[in-house]
Amino acid sequence: MISEAQKQQMAEAVAKIRETMAAAAKAAGRDPAEVRLCAACKTRTVEEVRYSADLPIDLFGENHVQELVEKTDANAYNGKPGHFIGHLQTNKVNKVVGRAALIQSVDSTRLLDKIDTAAARLGLVQDILVEINIGEEASKSGVDADSLFPLLEAAAAREHIRLRGLMAIPPADADDTETRRFFAQMRELLARADARHYDRAQMDILSMGMSHDYAAAIAEGATIVRVGTAIYGARDYSKKA
């Protein structure tokens, strides 16, 4: 059961995040409306998510397939889009395609093939982002920058996939200067990708920035920031959605 104190905390947190987002956008000479707030709701209950859906949150991001299934089935997002932002295994693609408005974490041609097949079966075109391992960390998913353009070309060749942009998570141990540099690299990669005019592509999404660095991401061109802890508080991994 979500308490009144939790509700107040969430409402105040989202209001503060919105203020910070608007200030960061204006400082960068951008329209605040260009940037959407994605609530990263991994481990959050259906009740928590349903309440937060009434706040000025634009969309929701799920890291786990089962949580996406449970929350979409329960209409926890209250009509707002749900995105898949975690590592997607090929054997779970069928549960995500058609449920997620956007799959943000595509990083292989094998995954592209599975998504394309599943989307064709449903008679739809699935929007995706390509995830870049911008810090070239062995422990993280995503393609390196050198492999990006061949993967974009492969995505553009799939009839039931539409490229929408790029996603990244900088290294957690990067300092503020390094993080800004990674975000700037992402902005430059998106511009280069957009200039190639891939078939069916609409390269207008740059998903980067989380609770601790979303203002810096906005300064460098993010159009989606993924914020979890700053909205819901510290995660309790013993809870199930």
Annotate each PLM feature.
Residues A222-K240:
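Gly/Pro- and small hydrophobic-enriched strand-loop and loop-to-helix capping segments
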Residues M1-H212, E220, Y232:
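Conserved alpha/beta-domain cores
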